[in-house]
């Protein structure tokens, strides 16, 4: 026998078994009894005098085991030698006391009780199985009604409910011919007598014969539950309990406090209540008490058990002495403080500490300063070991003493221990994987951790009192992973976008910018130097200044054919500072990268180039040197802020006067009634917005240039050396918007609801604010702070949902071999290329050959990873679109393949197997969310709103073409007025390639013609941004219909002007029901008073006024084509901010149907309008075969198509927000992906955040992972059920192999919350949200969790199947397969 096992009796053979899956089910009464070590009969806990557990009570030692190790309760048997003996006096087995954590007991219930989860967790499972309503079942269970369990020969129905009076009447009538019961017994009887297999047959037949949709849904649901029971072999009556398991006592402890009181777990109270009621019920049954008393006791028992299992699920929650609800078993596992999230997914760890961080500017990138005191504590065991090994201490106790006395040898040993032993630093909140990085510790005095300044960006740390936690990786493997994967110097690129995240900021940028700026006519200008050393000497002897323009010979290193560096000497026109900087450049980085004023963007490009050209190691060293240099020169520069640096532009007074005059003019127009109040407000806001911008521009022009005398004595402009300007220009701190507030004007402010206050703050911070101005300013500033707090929570929750939906997505194979993919084009908006094609395809794998459009030769073959070189080549050849692989179309079943994902952004090469790309995607999208939410208040609530666009201009020369949907009429002034809803002007270059595309709104005036040659900067069209006009396409005399004052239109008289206008009233607000359907319209008459018809038809022209329209024509007025009939004022402009942004991202990922969604054409065909019904318009689309599709559209909606127009399937026909589900259904997966990626990117772009499209695609893949079975074929699925895409694919392959009919399915788009909850793994779903519901469902289905994802493995305490853990899982899997093969072979040989 193994000696080691003597001391660990618990490690019996069964404990250490490896498992591959976890199955959940409903426990049968026999199972519960088999777990139990005895029945708990008394509600007592412990004897309050002796503190010993009461016999047969909730803490009984006989049932649950001894209180002290190897000692029975009465003390007859003590010590290890009696191990395993059961004391005959007190009945306690002598063993370890920790069995009290694992031995369960049970309570035999005197009456059966329904399990509340199966009753009340919606939809009620009991109700589904029995086909009864929840209300009915509850009436039976809580003793309000009888249920007929066996009607016998009587006309009663099975499952019929009878009230008490009914029951006694029927008893008198039929005698014992029928059975009816009350309470859980009745329900149990019904469940026991239900023939599951027979019921399934009946339901399947019904499913085929029925036609109604609701019925099919209902049957399918019942079928699913019943089939699950049938498959798993669980019995229906197990949902009703006869016997209740009792939790081991150490998991619900009773702790004596000082002063004779006890602290107890709520569960003990709940169990006591159950036992008390159960015992009382037993006694009443023995005494044959009257029915009514027994019934009441049974009901109370049912309620007690309900509270124990899930308190508060039904009725009022049971409360303890202090009036708060007791914590039941269900509460123990759910929510943030429950078992899953508190103890399984987030544990506290040993060997960790935390302290404040300070800056360590002398550190190297892979180092951090660790206070000696902390190191001593963290590395204690290692030090003890070393002390014993070196013979300085004979025992651990002695070593401990030495460490406590801090003898000198201890410090030497600490140095030794720490050498080459990385530690991990973490800053909360850890929003992405760079929130934990490994460093080599350097021992320092003091109590603060020193952090390298360049990693601050990754941690989002600053030194204003932030704290960080230290963790020590103990095992060799952990140290190795920390060093190779997590060391700060190995994490130069951001996983979100593949750009460097180790980028200098603030003082470093300022120093580098200062040293690389040039000054005109500085000391020693025009000197020639032989090499950098000479420049050094000249600089140190003050012959030249830092910004002096000089010519110098520089030696650069260039790679030759063989890949070796050889020196090349060139002469450069440069400055002293840049020449000095050239010394720290790594080999292979050309001097031209630093031969300019280095701003933050340039430095970022510099580090990026260094990484691509010189590799990781050189880049890290280079970054460090940049930092030291930057700090040094920032100190030498002595750049500071003074009041005089804030120069107020002289033009300010004039500009303000001009704006005030304009505002006065608008006010006058408003008084005359030419504009509405809303328009006036919008225009005033616009004027002030523009005025602010003009003042800001004047101020920046003033700040950025200064006059100097050059060498020849002429006065010239040079870039300013104003400190504030330099800080903003270099990107070190501040921005033009902030300088504008310091020395321009503060500008417009926002109210807390986001609308803009029309009186701006005209003064700036240098002049100071008046009391009123200060008061206006406080609004925005406070809102900013309040927003921040709310949004941080929102953003964290979004990240949590994203991580949850993608956590099991890991790269598992190299190539799935698909040739599917998406076609990538450059993103163009309004003629600006927002994202070039090269940016979008860099680091992707091509799905098909890339062909040169001019020569037709293949540039890049399919299946190639596009590197910078290849992308440049594609860019130069003028290719417009490239088809690339994408995670969405990857065919790998559980996980992704490397080729569909492409480049690992943080490493710059093809992604490795085992990379957890799902989690990285979730972090990359979630992390900036929090950053953005926090970035609202930095401008101090100043309204940042783009002045509304009122025209479009061409950006380049070319030819203007109108899109196919373009419709316009010429008005009597000869202007072309746009009357189409989705019109675009496209500009083609000389070869005919599309260069720009501009949307032109309805009612715009076109200033160009189709096919006209245009120049860059030419205006293409103009319009009024604040109102939408309503324009007539025909000429004639106005005749109103249903335009009745006080019924359909209201006369609005303006208080200020006294003028009145007619405004259309919203139908819902009209008084009588008849008037609700009336539609104010305008018809046109010719000179004879006959209605004018649409040319070529007999339909009279009739145009309806939309709600809120201000009618501008009068009855009987003559109008011409293109004239305005009415104006619809646009809502006032709110500030655009990520506030609208973060919820927008969440809305997209949750795939919510927007409030007033637009409509897409269901089929391709021709549009016509049918008869109106109930105030709705009937729109008909007829396809080529004459099949018509009809839809009703409410009057408020704006229809974008006209009679006779041809539309394509999926084209927008009714204005409104697009519903992503429609896009998926009508245009397919690629269109949907493009839409979501575009919309999400738009939000982030607005904030200047770069995220790779890949990450969004990874999440879309997870949103599309389930499909709806449209026709099950011969695959065994149920029509209409939702299943994993992979499962259908596998089933279809199998069906085709066997020659059966495969299933047809439709794609389904799930929001991220739903997708997380619908995952195959119930452990992952339960730990996410709605724990009770998930577990109830899983138990009924008898689900098995294969532990495929990361989360499940974390919860069961294994290595995750990603990264280095993937190999562990794979090898386990292989061993398991080998064992299976061997057993199979042995069986064959046996036979």
UniProtKB/Swiss-Prot annotation:
Mg(2+) binds at residues 462, 464, 466. One of its GO terms (cellular component) is DNA-directed RNA polymerase complex. This is DNA-directed RNA polymerase subunit beta'. DNA-dependent RNA polymerase catalyzes the transcription of DNA into RNA using the four ribonucleoside triphosphates as substrates. Zn(2+) 2 binds at residues 816, 890, 897, 900. One of its GO terms (biological process) is DNA-templated transcription. Its cofactor is Mg(2+); Zn(2+). GO terms for molecular function: DNA binding; DNA-directed RNA polymerase activity; magnesium ion binding; zinc ion binding. The keyword Nucleotidyltransferase applies. The gene is rpoC. Gene3D superfamilies: 1.10.132.30, 1.10.150.390, 1.10.1790.20, 1.10.40.90, 2.40.40.20, 2.40.50.100, RNA polymerase II, clamp domain, RNA polymerase Rpb1, domain 3. InterPro entries: DNA-dir_RpoC_beta_prime, DNA-dir_RpoC_beta_prime_bact, RNA_pol_asu, RNA_pol_N, RNA_pol_Rpb1_1, RNA_pol_Rpb1_3, RNA_pol_Rpb1_3_sf, RNA_pol_Rpb1_4. Pfam families: RNA_pol_Rpb1_1, RNA_pol_Rpb1_2, RNA_pol_Rpb1_3, RNA_pol_Rpb1_4, RNA_pol_Rpb1_5. It catalyses: RNA(n) + a ribonucleoside 5'-triphosphate = RNA(n+1) + diphosphate. It comes from Neisseria meningitidis serogroup C / serotype 2a (strain ATCC 700532 / DSM 15464 / FAM18). Binds 1 Mg(2+) ion per subunit. Binds 2 Zn(2+) ions per subunit. Keywords: DNA-directed RNA polymerase, Magnesium, Metal-binding, Nucleotidyltransferase, Transcription, Transferase, Zinc. The RNAP catalytic core consists of 2 alpha, 1 beta, 1 beta' and 1 omega subunit. When a sigma factor is associated with the core the holoenzyme is formed, which can initiate transcription. Zn(2+) 1 binds at residues 72, 74, 87, 90. Belongs to the RNA polymerase beta' chain family. Its EC number is 2.7.7.6.
């Amino acid at each position: 026998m193994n000696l080691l096992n003597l001391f660990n009796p618990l490690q019996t053979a069964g404990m250490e078994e490896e498992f591959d899956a976890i199955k959940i089910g409903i426990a049968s009464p026999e199972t519960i009894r088999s777990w139990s070590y005895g029945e708990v009969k008394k509600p007592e806990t412990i004897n309050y005098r002796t503190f010993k557990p009461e016999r047969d009570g909730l803490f009984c030692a006989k049932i649950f085991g001894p209180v002290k190790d190897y000692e029975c309760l009465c003390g007859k048997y003590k010590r290890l030698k009696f191990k395993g003996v059961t004391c005959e006096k007190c009945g306690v087995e002598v063993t370890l006391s920790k069995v009290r954590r694992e031995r369960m007991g049970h309570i035999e219930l005197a009456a059966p009780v329904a399990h509340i989860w199966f009753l009340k967790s919606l939809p009620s499972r009991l109700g589904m199985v029995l086909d009864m309503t929840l209300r009915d079942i509850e009436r039976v269970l809580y003793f309000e009604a009888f249920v007929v369990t066996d009607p016998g020969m009587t006309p009663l129905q099975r499952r019929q409910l009878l009230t008490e009076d009914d029951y006694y009447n029927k008893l008198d009538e039929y005698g014992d011919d029928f059975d009816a019961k009350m309470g859980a017994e009745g329900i149990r009887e019904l469940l026991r007598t239900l023939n599951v297999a027979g019921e399934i047959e009946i339901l399947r037949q019904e499913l085929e014969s029925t036609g109604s949709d609701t019925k099919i849904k209902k049957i399918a649901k019942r079928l699913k539950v019943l089939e699950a029971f049938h498959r798993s072999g669980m019995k229906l009556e197990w949902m009703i309990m006869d016997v209740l398991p009792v939790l081991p006592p150490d998991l619900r402890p009773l702790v004596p406090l000082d002063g004779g009181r006890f602290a107890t777990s709520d569960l003990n109270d709940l169990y006591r209540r159950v036992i008390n009621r159960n015992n009382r019920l037993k006694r009443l049954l023995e005494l044959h008490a009257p029915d009514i008393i027994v019934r009441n006791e049974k009901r109370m028992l049912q309620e007690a058990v309900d509270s124990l299992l899930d308190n508060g699920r039904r009725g009022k929650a049971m409360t303890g002495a202090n009036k708060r609800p007791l914590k039941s078993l269900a509460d123990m596992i759910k929510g943030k403080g429950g078992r899953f999230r508190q103890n399984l997914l987030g544990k506290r760890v040993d060997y960790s500490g935390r302290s404040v961080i300070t800056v360590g500017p002398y550190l190297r990138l892979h180092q951090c300063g660790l206070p000696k005191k902390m190191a001593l504590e963290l590395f204690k065991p290692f030090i003890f070991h070393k002390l014993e090994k070196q013979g300085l201490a004979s025992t651990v106790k002695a070593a401990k003493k030495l460490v406590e006395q801090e003898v000198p040898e201890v410090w030497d040993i600490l140095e030794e221990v720490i050498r080459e032993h990385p530690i991990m630093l973490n800053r909360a909140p850890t929003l992405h994987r760079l929130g934990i990085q490994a460093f080599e510790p350097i021992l320092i005095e003091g109590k603060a951790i020193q952090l390298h300044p360049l990693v601050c960006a990754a941690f989002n740390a600053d030194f204003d009192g932030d704290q960080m936690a230290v963790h020590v990786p103990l095992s060799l493997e952990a140290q190795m992973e920390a060093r190779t994967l997590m060391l700060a110097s190995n994490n130069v690129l951001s996983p979100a976008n593949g750009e460097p995240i180790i980028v200098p900021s603030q003082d470093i940028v300022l120093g580098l910018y200062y040293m690389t700026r040039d000054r005109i006519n500085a000391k020693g200008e025009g000197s020639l130097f032989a090499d950098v050393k000479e420049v050094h000497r000249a600089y140190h002897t003050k012959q030249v200044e830092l910004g002096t323009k000089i010519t110098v010979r520089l030696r650069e290193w260039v790679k030759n054919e063989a890949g070796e560096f050889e020196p090349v000497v060139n002469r450069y026109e440069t400055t002293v500072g840049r020449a000095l900087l050239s010394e720290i450049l790594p080999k292979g980085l050309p001097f031209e990268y630093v031969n300019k004023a280095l701003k933050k963007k340039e430095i970022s490009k510099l580090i990026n180039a260094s990484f691509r050209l010189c590799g990781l190691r050189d880049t890290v060293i280079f970054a460090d040197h940049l930092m030291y240099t930057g700090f040094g020169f920032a100190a030498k520069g002595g750049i500071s802020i003074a009041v005089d640096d804030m120069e107020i532009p002289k033009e300010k007074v004039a500009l303000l006067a001009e704006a005030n005059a304009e505002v006065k003019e608008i006010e006058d127009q408003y008084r005359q009634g030419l504009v509405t109040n809303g328009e006036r407000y919008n225009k005033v806001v616009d004027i002030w917005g523009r005025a602010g911008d003009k003042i800001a521009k004047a101020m920046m022009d003033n700040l950025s240039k200064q006059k100097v005398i050059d060498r020849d004595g002429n006065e010239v402009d040079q870039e300013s050396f104003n400190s504030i300007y330099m800080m903003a220009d270099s990107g070190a701190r501040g921005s033009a918007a902030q300088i504008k507030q310091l020395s321009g004007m503060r500008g417009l402010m926002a109210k807390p609801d986001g609308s803009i206050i029309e009186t701006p703050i005209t003064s700036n911070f240098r002049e100071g604010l008046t009391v009123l101005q200060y008061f206006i300013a406080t609004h925005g500033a406070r809102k900013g702070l309040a927003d921040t707090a709310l949004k941080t929570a929102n953003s964290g929750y979004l990240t949590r949902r994203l991580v949850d939906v993608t956590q099991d997505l890991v790269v598992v194979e190299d190539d799935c071999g698909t040739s599917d993919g998406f076609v990538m084009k450059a993103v163009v908006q309004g003629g600006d290329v927002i994202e070039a094609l090269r940016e979008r395809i860099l680091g992707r794998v091509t799905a098909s050959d890339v062909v040169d459009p001019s020569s037709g030769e293949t540039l890049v073959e399919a299946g190639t990873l596009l590197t910078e070189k290849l992308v440049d080549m594609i860019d130069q050849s003028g290719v417009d679109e490239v088809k690339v692989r994408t995670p969405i179309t990857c065919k790998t079943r559980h996980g992704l393949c490397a080729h569909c994902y492409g480049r690992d952004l943080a490493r710059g090469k093809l992604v490795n197997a085992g990379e957890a790309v799902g989690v990285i995607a979730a972090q990359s999208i979630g992390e900036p969310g929090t950053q953005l939410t926090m970035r609202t208040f930095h401008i101090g609530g100043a309204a940042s709103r783009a002045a509304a666009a009122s025209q479009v201009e061409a950006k380049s020369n070319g030819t203007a073409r109108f899109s196919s949907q373009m419709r316009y009429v010429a008005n009597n002034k000869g202007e072309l007025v746009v009357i189409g809803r989705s019109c675009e002007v496209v500009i083609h270059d000389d070869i005919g390639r599309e260069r720009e595309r501009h949307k032109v709104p309805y009612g715009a005036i076109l200033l160009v013609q189709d096919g006209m040659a245009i120049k860059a900067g030419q205006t293409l069209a103009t319009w009024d941004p604040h109102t939408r006009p309503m324009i007539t396409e025909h000429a004639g005399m106005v005749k109103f219909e249903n335009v009745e004052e006080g019924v359909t239109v209201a006369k609005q008289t303006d208080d200020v002007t006294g003028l009145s206008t007619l405004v259309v009233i919203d139908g819902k607000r009209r008084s009588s029901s008849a008037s609700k359907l009336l539609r104010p319209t305008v018809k046109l008459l010719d000179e004879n008073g006959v209605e004018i018809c649409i040319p070529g038809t007999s339909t009279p022209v009739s145009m309806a006024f939309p709600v809120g329209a201000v009618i501008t024509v009068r009855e009987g007025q003559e109008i011409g084509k293109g004239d305005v009939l009415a104006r619809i004022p646009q809502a006032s402009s709110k500030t655009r901010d990520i506030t609208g942004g973060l919820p927008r991202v969440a809305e997209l990922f949750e795939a919510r149907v927007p409030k007033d969604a637009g409509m897409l054409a269901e089929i391709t065909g021709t549009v016509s309008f049918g008869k109106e019904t109930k105030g709705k318009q009937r729109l008909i689309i007829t396809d080529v075969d004459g099949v018509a599709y009809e839809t009703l559209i409410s009057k408020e909606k704006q229809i974008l198509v006209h009679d006779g127009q041809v539309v394509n399937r999926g084209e927008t026909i009714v204005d409104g927000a697009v519903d992503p589900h429609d896009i998926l259904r009508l245009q397919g997966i690629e269109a949907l992906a493009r839409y979501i990626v575009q919309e999400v990117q738009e939000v982030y772009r607005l904030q200047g955040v770069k995220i790779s499209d890949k990450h969004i695609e990874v999440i879309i893949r997870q949103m599309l992972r389930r499909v709806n079975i449209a026709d099950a074929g011969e695959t065994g699925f149920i029509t209409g059920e939702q299943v994993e895409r992979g499962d259908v694919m596998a089933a279809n392959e199998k069906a085709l192999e066997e020659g059966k009919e495969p299933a047809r399915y439709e794609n389904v788009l799930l929001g991220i919350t739903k997708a997380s909850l619908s995952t195959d793994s119930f452990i992952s779903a339960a730990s996410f949200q709605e724990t009770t519901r998930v577990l109830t469902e899983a138990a009924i289905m008898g689900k098995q969790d294969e532990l495929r994802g990361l989360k499940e493995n974390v919860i069961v305490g294994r290595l995750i199947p990603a990264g280095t853990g993937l190999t562990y899982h794979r090898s386990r899997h292989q061993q398991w397969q080998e064992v299976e093969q061997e057993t199979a072979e042995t069986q064959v040989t046996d036979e």
